[in-house]
């Protein structure tokens, strides 16, 4: 019931915050992904997994 959309918005907000905090790191990561498309899907999945675990831990602590 529209839950997917709110989740996407939530992830987008987190992504924006991460980008503002870790701008150089993320820019470097993006350039690496552009250079090597073989790793890009794997790395993106890894980032998503890490973000999910981080958010779960964060939610438990607050």
UniProtKB/Swiss-Prot annotation:
UniProt KW Plastid keyword: yes
Superkingdom: Eukaryota
Localization terms from the record: Plastid, Chloroplast
Cellular compartments per GO CC: chloroplast
Keywords: Chloroplast, Plastid
Keyword Plastid part of the UniProt annotation: yes
Name this protein carries in UniProt: Uncharacterized 7.3 kDa protein in petA 5'region
Organism encoding this protein: Chlamydomonas reinhardtii (Chlamydomonas smithii)
């Amino acid at each position: 019931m529209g839950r997917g959309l709110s989740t996407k918005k939530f992830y987008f907000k987190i992504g924006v915050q991460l980008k503002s905090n870790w701008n150089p790191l993320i820019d470097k990561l993006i350039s690496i992904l552009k250079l090597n498309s073989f790793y890009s899907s794997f790395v993106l999945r890894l980032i998503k997994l890490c973000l999910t675990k981080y958010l779960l831990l964060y939610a438990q602590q607050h």
